[in-house]
C-alpha cells in the first residue's frame, strides 16, 4: 500500500519557514519498506529502501531523464552519517510540543550532561535522527500514518526504529483499521 502526504508540515508551509515536506512510502504487511521525503525549499531528498539502505541527496531540483537508482545512490550520502557530537541532541516539534514531550526532555537532561534541543517542523525531525544529526525525536501527540510512514522507512533503512509511545518496544504499524 502506498501512503502519500503531499504537504507534511502544513503549519510550517503557512508560516513560510521552509520546514515542510512531500512524503511517499510503500508499506508491506504493516511495515514501511520504501520511503521518500523531499524538502522543496532546501532541495534535499531523503530516500530509502530495505534492500538498499538510507540516503540523502542535496541540491536536487529535477531528475535527469536518464536518472537511475544507481546514479541517485552514487550522488548521495549514506545514512546515518558518522557525525561526532559532544552532546545528546533531541529534536522536537515546532508546532506540537506537549507537556509529555517537555517532561521527556527534562528526563533526558537528567541523564546527559550536555543536551541540545532542536525544533523543527514536519517529518524533517525523523530525517535528522536517521541522518545522525539528532539522537531522539520524542512525539507523544497523536499522529497519522501519512505523517510517519516515509520517515519510518528511512529510519529503518538507517538501522533505527520508531516505537509507539504507549507501548515501549512495539514499532509503529501501518494500514491499521483505526488511523
Task: Indicate where each model-derived feature is located.
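DPxDG-like acidic metal-binding loop motif
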Residues: 1-59, 66
Amino acid at each position: 500500500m502506498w501512503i502519500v502526504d503531499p504537504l507534511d508540515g502544513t503549519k510550517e508551509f503557512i508560516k513560510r519557514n521552509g520546514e515542510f515536506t512531500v512524503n511517499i512510502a510503500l508499506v508491506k504487511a504493516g511495515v514501511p519498506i520504501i520511503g521518500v521525503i523531499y524538502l522543496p525549499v532546501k532541495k534535499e531528498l531523503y530516500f530509502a529502501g530495505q534492500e538498499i539502505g538510507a540516503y540523502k541527496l542535496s541540491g536536487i531540483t529535477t531528475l535527469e531523464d536518464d536518472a537511475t537508482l544507481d546514479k541517485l545512490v552514487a550522488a548521495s550520502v549514506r545514512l546515518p552519517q558518522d557525525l561526532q557530537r559532544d552532546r545528546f541532541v533531541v529534536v522536537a516539534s515546532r508546532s506540537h510540543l506537549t507537556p509529555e514531550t517537555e517532561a521527556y526532555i527534562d528526563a533526558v537532561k537528567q541523564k546527559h550532561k550536555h543536551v541540545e534541543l532542536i525544533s523543527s517542523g514536519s517529518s524533517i525531525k525523523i530525517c535528522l535522527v536517521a541522518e545522525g544529526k539528532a539522537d531522539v525525536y520524542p512525539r507523544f501527540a497523536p499522529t497519522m500514518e501519512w505523517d510517519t510512514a516515509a520517515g519510518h522507512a528511512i529510519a529503518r533503512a538507517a538501522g533505527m526504529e520508531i516505537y509507539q509511545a504507549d507501548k515501549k518496544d512495539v514499532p509503529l504499524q501501518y494500514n491499521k483499521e483505526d488511523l
